[in-house]
Amino acid sequence: MLAPVAAILLLCAAAPPATPRPPSFSAGLDMVNVTVTVRDAHGKLVTDLQPDDFIVKEDGRPQVVEVFARAHEPGQDEVLTLDLGMLLDTSTSMLEQLKLSQEAATRFLEAVPRARELITIFFDHEIRVSKYDSENQQGLYDRIHAAKGGGDTALYDAMAVYLSRVEGTSGRKVLVMFTDGDDSRSELMLPEVIQLLRSSRVAVYPICFPSFAPGSTRAVKARAVLQSFADMTGGAIFNPSQSRELAAIYQKILDELGAQYVLGYVSDNQKTDGKLRRLVVDLPNRKDLKVRHRTSYIVKPREEGSAPAR
């Protein structure tokens, strides 16, 4: 799996590399941070929960929560800091939707709160990476609107490039994707991308622009793939059909980012065997609430002198 990823990264060598940041681990112990969104039965975000309200289980075993932070409160900057990634599909299948997608991307950037880092990836059969800080967005707007459509779709490869660039960074990592969900070009296969997502702490928010006949096999499959990315990472999927729907979608994403909790624990399983670990976050005394979070993670085998990624 690593060889295709390395080949993809070579295509993007001209782009400036993201600066690695050490995770917020202490005393040699490895913290697992889980970002959690909580809503009530009416879909309203719940922001007043306390640490004792939560139970975090890994492979069925309760863990001791040592870090608790709310996005709407000051402090805990290291675990709450936002790194934003944006994937913009410019392939042939998106030609009819490209203008709407470009409008969606720029409107989202105008609305998003200040992020520590902003990485934008344009992709068709090629992958083009741009990195801007939040003080220099005009150049990014110009590039978005200058993007031309054409070529096959390397969605999975583009995701792999983004995931590699934020590997090892602390804080919350959010990937917003403007795409129809189809992939016709990638070297990576879907199971490999899923493996990469499980090894990351990236929440995926696909904004899906269907470019195939409604109900067709291709359309159903593409949407199902995007839905799976959102579900497994604790993100959410949106399906706008008109530009007037975009503002409400952005507000939902931004409201969610501003209402999240981060729960951190040191796993009672200190093996670095590369095996999948299942996560469950429960509110035993608030069964009326719905909790969303990443559902699993993989601990990469530890390299000598380094901490494993979680």
Model feature map: region roles:
Residues L2-A13:
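Bacterial N-terminal signal peptides
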Residues A14-R310:
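Scaffold/interface architecture of coatomer-like assemblies
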